């Protein structure tokens, strides 16, 4: 069953931010997705500041 696990990429290695139930040396597939903060940063250059602030208020 697929699981979503957040990880940080440091020095060429993906480091999970939570405990994972894997055996040493087990191979897995990774699907890399941008986080919402990364998406907002990308579009903030294209969106009026007032519109961005309204969007962030609605997301809370």
From Swiss-Prot:
Sorted UniProt keywords: Toxin-antitoxin system
Family that this chain belongs to: Belongs to the UPF0165 family.
Species per Swiss-Prot/TrEMBL record: Archaeoglobus fulgidus (strain ATCC 49558 / DSM 4304 / JCM 9628 / NBRC 100126 / VC-16)
Protein name: Putative antitoxin AF_1087
Physiological role: Possibly the antitoxin component of a type II toxin-antitoxin (TA) system.
Domain of life, source organism: Archaea
InterPro entries in the cross-refs: AF2212-like, AF2212-like_dom_sf
